[in-house]
Amino acid sequence: MSHDESRGSAGGYAGSVSRRGVLGGAAVVATSAMTGAPPAAAASGTPPGAGSGVVPPLWREFTRNPFTHPQLPFVGRAGCRGGSARQTRPRVVADVRDFGAVADGTTDCAPAINRALAAAGRAGGGTVALPPGTLRIDGIVRVAHSGVVLRGAGSHRTVLRATRHLTDLVGPYGSRYGGDKSSWSWAGGLIWLAPEARWNSLTEAIGAKQWPFEGWTGNRRDEWRTLATVSPARRGSWTVRVSDTSRLRPGDLVLLRVADDADHTLLAHMAGDGPGTGSYSWDDKTKLTSYVPYEWPVRVTEVHGRRVTLERPLPLDLRPEWDPRLTTHAGALTGAGVEGLTLEAPEVPQQPHLLDLGYNGVVLQCAYDCRVDDVTVRNADNGFGLVAASACTLSRTRVAGRGSHHPYFCREGSHDNLIEDFTVEERTTPAPADTQLHGINVEGLSSYNVWSRGVMEMGTFDSHRGMPFANVRTEITVDNNGRHGGDASAGPLFGARFAHWNIRVTNGRAGLMRIDGLAPWSATVGINEVREFDQIDVPDFTGDLNARLELYGTTDAVRPRNLYEAQRGLGR
């Protein structure tokens, strides 16, 4: 992404006969039996439907200690509204045809769609309906108001056909870290969900060539004020003691801000405080150190005296030297979404690596409790993006067409998101020289995200440096032919508590799949036999990684099959 990554081919592919046939059959296995264990069964450590499968010791340990387990993160509340399967269906308040849109494939409908979305925002939210057919868009479609959902007639019936890229529409976008890279290689979308004021300030900065930070506290990370300081607390706590609750109410969306100290003990803690963190050279990882303070959006659920209860357990310990505090933020998009459509970019060749023009798909930025459902992106440089987005759900999404740089990306401190029932199709044209394929990306201290029930006909589990931590990939079938990226100054590939659970690797390549030799305090559980070839990594930290490997060499044997679904049954 914003990185001096090694250039080269899209990665080796070997050992797979009739790739679509193998992956298609695996998809049936991968989606046939989710656990969804109720609390009593899950707590017992024996999920229903275990059948002939094997419950590993690690799962039994976890059920006794779900919120503070050393290797497995608690992600049972990831996703929109705590991962609720119930999807609200706001009433239709606007039809784009009433604002001038025509599904004839030739009329530029972007202005009409945006007028309808703005009208829905002024009405306080609701659904904006798109008709079946093909609607040409010559501009960015902007979902900029909370409670507004853009809904087509289904991904097989409604097509938005884009004609222009983000470099043309917004302007060239350089990297805040220097060099000649295009930030459209990892940012922005032709359907862009972001609060209006934040989007305006971001694009104005790009136009002025003042390359911005992209997250919750503005272009210079200075748009916040303290609501309360927080007393020391342990990871996994749901309730914290604060200095003052006069400005806190149930339902408030706040930021937990946690700063690093001169010895980088916060970064060491994110890596698990293992033996190698003390000798690791943090000071020269200037890109990584620019990512702190860690900013974690969360809703307040209860306020009693000076005790504040949160909707999710703390992601980290809170220590006095890290100056933990609850703060305001620059604004959020909440309760918004996109459903039932295909976004199709022109089928033009990919640009060289890190020089994307910005034929990008759907991006959620400074978004919370938002949802994308039944959406396909075709011929995109970058498919679906989470940029400083938290507690969002992407379900039934698909990346298809001529191939992409990042089919999915999750960066700039994105947390607690759920990407489920996703597909990365095999590319329809060969990869041009000097391009690179990643896969399902995570970076930039992003944490507690879940990728669940996926089929990847190409790509890899792209831990893209920037030390993401506590992320889960579960019940996924993958032809592991992509490569990870990441600048050396962005630091480690992995922080603590990465979990790869019930993974089928159809071409037998180990890289970024089996991570017990790479990722500190990690868990690799229920993966078939793999071997090292193509891109081969070494651990960032010396000494014992305290990683776990269980049920290695098995296929669909681990129970529960899906780590996220099983954790849904474990609550407070």
Specify the residue positions occupied by each region the protein language model found.
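Right-handed parallel beta-helix
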Residues: 147, 156, 199-224, 260-287, 293, 301, 334-345, 368-379, ...
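Catalytic domains of carbohydrate-active enzymes that cleave complex glycans
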Residues: 453-454, 458, 474-572
